[in-house]
């Protein structure tokens, strides 16, 4: 789904199939969703209704003895002042409370109309590459600052990457599921980028 917002008694219609698929998967294995720039306002819906963990900013985890952290990455490496301001405004409790006060039909209509204009989506391949390079540099610095971390997973730029940034430390951006059906796997200290096939 393009956008998720948890209302008290309403589930956004446009994401129902994704939610159903995640609920089914959660019955087979533990899942934690990490909020991004379009879906960090989930409240307790995922956990209470579906048994899916939700981390609005970042999730720390240990899998098979590997310590890692996953975060979306929005608001971290943007260089234009308007993107930084927009992230602060959209994350502010007052903004969220005002939006929650809108009727869900109006709120979702508003998001549909504004989604193409808001945000910090890079406009050219050069901007995408520069944004991905800044994100990787940020991830490398974060891993250097936390040597106990073996894995840092980020998205946001949608530029797939699996990089060993230091001995025993990986930076992974799985890419975008909606643009090439990409994902990543990590096993035995190695990261692999892959593509879903029909």
Which residues make up each language-model segment?
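Active-site-proximal loop/helix segment associated with metal-binding centers of metalloenzymes
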Residues: 71-135
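Phosphate-binding glycine-rich loops and adjacent basic patches that engage nucleotide phosphates
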Residues: 3-7, 25, 95-107, 143-144
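N-terminal start-of-chain detector that recognizes signal peptides
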Residues: 3-5, 32-33, 40-44, 122-126, ...
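Short C-terminal domain-edge/linker segments immediately following a structured domain
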Residues: 24-29, 63-66, 98-105, 183-186
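Conserved beta-sheet core of the metallophosphoesterase superfamily
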Residues: 49-58, 67-69, 74, 78-86, ...
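Core catalytic region of metal-dependent phosphoesterases/phosphodiesterases
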Residues: 1-63
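Soluble or luminal CAZymes and related metallo-dependent hydrolases
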Residues: 14-17, 130-138
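Short low-complexity stretches enriched in small and charged residues
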Residues: 22-30, 72, 105-110, 126-127, ...
């Amino acid at each position: 789904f393009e956008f998720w917002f948890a209302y008290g008694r309403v589930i956004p219609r446009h994401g129902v199939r994704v939610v159903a698929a995640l609920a089914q998967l959660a019955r087979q294995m533990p899942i934690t969703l990490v909020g991004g720039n379009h879906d960090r306002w989930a409240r307790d819906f995922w956990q209470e209704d579906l048994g899916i963990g939700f981390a609005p900013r970042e999730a720390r985890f240990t899998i098979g003895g590997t310590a890692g952290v996953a975060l979306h990455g929005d608001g971290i490496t943007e260089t234009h002042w308007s993107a930084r301001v927009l992230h602060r405004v959209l994350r502010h409790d007052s903004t969220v409370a005002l939006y929650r006060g809108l009727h869900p039909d109006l709120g979702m209509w508003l998001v549909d109309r504004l989604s193409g204009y808001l945000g910090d989506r890079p406009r050219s391949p050069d901007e995408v590459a520069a944004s991905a390079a800044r994100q990787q540099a940020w991830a490398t610095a974060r891993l250097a600052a936390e040597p106990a971390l073996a894995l840092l997973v980020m998205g946001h730029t949608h530029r797939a990457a699996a990089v060993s940034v230091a001995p025993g430390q990986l930076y992974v951006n799985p890419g975008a599921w909606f643009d090439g059906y990409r994902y990543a796997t990590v096993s035995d200290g190695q990261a692999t980028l892959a593509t879903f096939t029909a």
